Amino acid sequence: VVVCPVDPYVDNIYYEAVEQLQKLAEEGNANLTLMGIEPTYPSEKYGYIMPLSGEKVSKVKEFKEKPNKETAEKYINENALWNAGIFAFKLSYLLAKAHSLIDFTDYRDLFNKYDGLKKISFDYAVVEKEESIQVLRYSGDWKDVGTWNMMAEVMADKTKGKVVLDEECENTNVVNELNIPILC
């Protein structure tokens, strides 16, 4: 199983890396396989992966979700990678982990207990505590396009589709997926 966010800005080798991630998970050398990104600044928005080596695929010494800025700087100085939010694992691992964290007998029982489950992310509940993790270093283009500001930054043109911008429009980006012109 490979879990991916839907909002990264990536190049085509990203998809090859996701395939490689899936193959690494199938091989079973670790319970979890993560994709690591070379950090460009100390961020409190990402988890940090501390690999044991500088190789393309490495065992992980430690994973820390969203540290403060000072700790993020320390991790970067120790060659940590950002967690891209991409996890690969065998389904049997996830089922065993779910049973160890939640007392349930079958899907219906789990469904009935859903509202009472603790609200905690996979990163905190599972990844930070997992001892058997490996990381695949991703070297292509990657940006987390989770905000409109970042979307505007990665757009090559200020407009997409049938758009006419007035000369006085400032700080305006328009994406028009309709066949009807937009005048701004």
Which residues does each predicted region cover?
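A conserved mid-domain beta-alpha-beta active-site/ligand-binding segment of alpha/beta enzyme cores
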Residues: 72-92, 98
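Conserved hydrophobic/aromatic beta-strand scaffold that supports enzyme active sites
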Residues: 32-34, 48, 62, 86-88, ...
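Short, basic and Ser/Thr-rich N-terminal targeting/leader segments
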Residues: 4, 31-33, 42-45, 80-82, ...
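Left-handed beta-helix
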Residues: 89-184
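Conserved beta-loop-beta/alpha segment of the NTase-like Rossmann-fold superfamily
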Residues: 1-54, 95-100
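Glycine-rich beta-alpha junction loops
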Residues: 8, 39-42, 67-69, 88-93, ...
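A short, charged helix-loop
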Residues: 51-81
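Flexible, glycine/proline-enriched loop segments at strand-loop-helix junctions
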Residues: 5-12, 58-63, 81-85, 112-113
